[in-house]
């Protein structure tokens, strides 16, 4: 993600405070100059940058600050707070109501990725258990219905449109009525793309809006136009009641920071951001976690939400086995399935403190996914005895012929099968040691159930299993321990005050 360049530069500026022997006005000004330069390079409006600098300066009075206070943390906190303010419109975003029929109308410029974003939003809510559907009321662009139909079919989302009807108002009205009668909860209407000077298309947009009475009008914005987003968003807000904004193409443009801050300046809440072309390259936008991830400080709350989506608590049989230190090849297979359900690896890594959003490139991500699928293919060729044995690796070592059979069945080499078994053995050994830690699987606040010495042992085991580069990115053992503490607090629902500056 190109936005990661901005995150890297700001993080580098903040870290310069740690290298300074004395924190004085000169050090503060040098750091602020670096931060402001990075923001200007990301096309953030100069007035907003100037305001950020003034706000930090007024919040930090080095001469008046008590000697016992940690000046570095105070400055870092002030910068973090101002960065959050930069992308926060100060308006609560609209959210759909479960059990109700929520009609969402999409508007935006041509080429902003509106039709693709409609499908992404429908897929996002579908994965969360909502009954979603799509309506194509874009009769202006040739191929619009074909594109929506293709996206919807691929994601198995019901859709409505017409090749013969040319009146978007009729299509939208008929589609909404049809899906309301079928009790759909999220009804998404895609409209024709337009430019702000096209009065006829704006009139059409108003007619569609008046006909279907949407609960939420979403404006889709292309991040590549940077701070010009502000004028575009205002033009749309003047015509229709735009309640939310989705910013697309944040993965490929250096002006993303300018786009986000410009939208916030219009007092329109950003609800999602598009970070790639795939249907799951789509993330809910929350200001504080976004800035936290941008600066490599992670988003533990988001990570816990992802884990909770998998409903792992329902798997009582697995929890019971883990309590006794048992872990089979089938368990590993199921965990691989869960990892794939959580979405793109880069999104997950970005939520872990110490990792920037750029840690894993698209190429590496595809390679990792392919490797995971390959391991699952190998396990698909194993029989029940091999998958369900509490010591799966021993079953294969006693009868090496099994390795050859599995390799032939999955179309891989015997070495690939052996590598899988080695990986499984490491997992199984760790689970065995975790099973000896009383209170680890009780649920609730782990820090109350598990002693400090036991937690330290668990952290050491995790560190041994990790790739050294990964551990380094997390800030070594201290970073790993900090993440585990945050995860414990998050699991207990205590997310307040988690700023994560201790590893800066």
Swiss-Prot record:
Q: What are the annotated disulfide bridges?
A: none
Q: Which GO terms describe its cellular component?
A: cytoplasm; cytosol; endoplasmic reticulum; nuclear speck; nucleus; signal recognition particle, endoplasmic reticulum targeting
Tell me the Gene3D superfamilies matching this sequence: P-loop containing nucleotide triphosphate hydrolases (3.40.50.300), Signal recognition particle SRP54, nucleotide-binding domain (1.20.120.140), Signal recognition particle, SRP54 subunit, M-domain (1.10.260.30)
Quote the record's binding site residues for GTP: 108-115, 190-194, 248-251
Q: Where is this region: NG-domain?
A: 1-295
Give the record's GO biological process terms. exocrine pancreas development; granulocyte differentiation; neutrophil chemotaxis; protein targeting to ER; SRP-dependent cotranslational protein targeting to membrane, signal sequence recognition; SRP-dependent cotranslational protein targeting to membrane, translocation
Instruction: Kindly report, in one word, the top-level EC class recorded for this enzyme.
Output: hydrolase
Source domain of life is Eukaryota
Entry-linked Pfam families: SRP54, SRP54_N, SRP_SPB
Q: Where is this region: M-domain?
A: 296-504
**GO MF, one annotated term:** GTP binding
Which HAMAP family does the record associate with it? Answer: SRP54
UniProt xrefs under NCBIfam families: SRP54_euk
Q: What is this protein called?
A: Signal recognition particle subunit SRP54
Source organism of the structure: Rattus norvegicus (Rat)
**Where is the organism placed in the taxonomic lineage, from the top?**
Eukaryota, Metazoa, Chordata, Craniata, Vertebrata
């Amino acid at each position: 993600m190109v936005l990661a360049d901005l995150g890297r530069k700001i993080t580098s500026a903040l870290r310069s405070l740690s290298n300074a022997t004395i924190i004085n006005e000169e050090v503060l000004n040098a750091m602020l100059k670096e931060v402001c330069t990075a923001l200007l390079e990301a096309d953030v409006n100069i007035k907003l940058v100037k305001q950020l600098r003034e706000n930090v300066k007024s919040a930090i009075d080095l001469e008046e600050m008590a000697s016992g206070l940690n000046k570095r943390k105070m400055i870092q906190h002030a910068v973090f707070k101002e960065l959050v303010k930069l992308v926060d419109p100060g308006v609560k975003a609209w959210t759909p109501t479960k059990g109700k029929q929520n009609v969402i109308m999409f508007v935006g410029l041509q080429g902003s990725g509106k039709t693709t974003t409609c499908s992404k939003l429908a897929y996002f809510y579908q994965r969360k258990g909502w009954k979603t559907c799509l309506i194509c009321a874009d009769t202006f662009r040739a191929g619009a219905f074909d594109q929506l139909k293709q996206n919807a079919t691929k994601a198995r989302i019901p859709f409505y449109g017409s090749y013969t009807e040319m009146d978007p108002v009729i299509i939208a009205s008929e589609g909404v009525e049809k899906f309301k009668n079928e009790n759909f909860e999220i009804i998404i209407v895609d409209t024709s793309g337009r430019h702000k000077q096209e009065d006829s298309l704006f009139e059409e947009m108003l007619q569609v809006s008046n006909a279907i009475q949407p609960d939420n009008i979403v404006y889709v914005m292309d991040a590549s136009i940077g701070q010009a987003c502000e004028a575009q968003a205002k033009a749309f807000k003047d015509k229709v009641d735009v309640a939310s904004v989705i910013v697309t193409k944040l993965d490929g443009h250096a002006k993303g920071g300018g786009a986000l801050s410009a939208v916030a300046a219009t007092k329109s809440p950003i609800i999602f951001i598009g970070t790639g072309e795939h249907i799951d390259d789509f993330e809910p936008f929350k200001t504080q976690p976004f800035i936290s991830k941008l600066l490599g400080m992670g988003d533990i709350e988001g990570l816990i939400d992802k884990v909770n989506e998998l409903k792992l608590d329902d798997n009582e049989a697995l929890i019971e086995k883990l309590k006794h230190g048992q872990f089979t090849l089938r368990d590993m297979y199921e965990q691989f399935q869960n990892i794939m359900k959580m979405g793109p690896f880069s999104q997950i890594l970005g939520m872990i403190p110490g990792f920037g959003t750029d840690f894993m490139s698209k190429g590496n991500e595809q390679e990792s996914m392919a490797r995971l699928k390959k391991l699952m293919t190998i396990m698909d060729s194993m029989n029940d005895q091999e998958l369900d044995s509490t010591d799966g690796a021993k079953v294969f070592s006693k009868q090496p012929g099994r390795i050859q059979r599995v390799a032939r069945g999955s179309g891989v080499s015997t070495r690939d099968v052996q590598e899988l078994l080695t990986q499984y053995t490491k997992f199984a050994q760790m689970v065995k040691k975790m099973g000896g830690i009383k209170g680890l699987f009780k649920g609730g606040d782990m820090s109350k159930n598990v002693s400090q010495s036991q937690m330290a042992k668990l952290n050491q085991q995790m560190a041994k299993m990790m790739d050294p580069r990964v551990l380094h990115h997390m800030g070594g053992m201290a970073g790993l321990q900090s993440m585990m503490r945050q995860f414990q607090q998050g699991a207990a629902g205590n997310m307040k005050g988690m700023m994560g500056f201790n590893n800066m």
